[in-house]
């Protein structure tokens, strides 16, 4: 009876008469009863059987591919921790940023090393007083060579001093100064035009090799065996020249040695450059910025010295 009153009350005026005139007859819609209170719902009392139909299965808020059934085995124990999804979605981008920062750090250190070496070479080349002094005192050359060798072994073989600040920068500074002295003394025996010419050739070659190493798809880091064989060939060729030099100077043999040395260290420059990139077979850790700068610096210095032996003219 109550439902009939509610049904009549909810109709618009004149609707009932129009339906009777047309001979239509409709059943009044059933109005659901009020929902149970919280106490009744939790205690199970006051509910009549069949009063409320069973609701449909809850639909997950995420799509089916993103939904994980807690009762199923996902293959990972304990599931993903909080923030793990964000780590995977940004890992490659963060790794690329770290690699770019590493490359900038290496080339910043390398630029400082090359500027210091260039200043020492210019001092030993243009200043006659300094040039005469270093040539008259070869003991400083051998002392610098000993310091260079000791610091190079320390930085190349000991990861502790190489990775810990400030010892890594202190050792690298000593290494750079000793190598700059050796390069400057070698340059003092050649005329100014030869030194400037070799500096320009070295700059062009190193810049071209660096750009090529970054752009090419060829992986130089996978050719370390070939580079080792070439390095051993260069070593034994230099040993042979050292044995023959006191007896007789062979110009063509010395020229072949200089060409071989410049070619080998040009390949090593490409190899060490690609070690910085991180998308090759072998790559340096971002912690090894000192080691990366050390290798490329040595490659450039050796290329310059071999060009100096090949194109340089001795002072009169």
From Swiss-Prot:
Keywords: Apoptosis, Cell membrane, Glycoprotein, Membrane, Postsynaptic cell membrane, Synapse, Transmembrane, Transmembrane helix. The keyword Heme does not apply. The keyword Chaperone does not apply. It is a multi-pass membrane protein. One of its GO terms (molecular function) is calcium channel activity. Glycans are attached at residue 191. It comes from Rattus norvegicus. Belongs to the BI1 family. LFG subfamily. This is Protein lifeguard 2. Expressed at high levels on dendrites and to a lesser extent on the soma and axons of neurons in various regions of brain. Interacts with FAS/TNFRSF6 and BAX. The chain crosses the membrane at residues 106-126, 138-158, 165-185, 194-214, 225-245, 251-271, 290-310. Antiapoptotic protein which protects cells uniquely from Fas-induced apoptosis. Regulates Fas-mediated apoptosis in neurons by interfering with caspase-8 activation. Plays a role in cerebellar development by affecting cerebellar size, internal granular layer (IGL) thickness, and Purkinje cell (PC) development. GO terms for biological process: apoptotic signaling pathway; cerebellar granular layer development; cerebellar Purkinje cell differentiation; cerebellar Purkinje cell layer development; cerebellum development; negative regulation of apoptotic signaling pathway; negative regulation of extrinsic apoptotic signaling pathway via death domain receptors; negative regulation of neuron apoptotic process. Residues 1-49 are annotated as: Disordered. CDD domains: LFG_like.
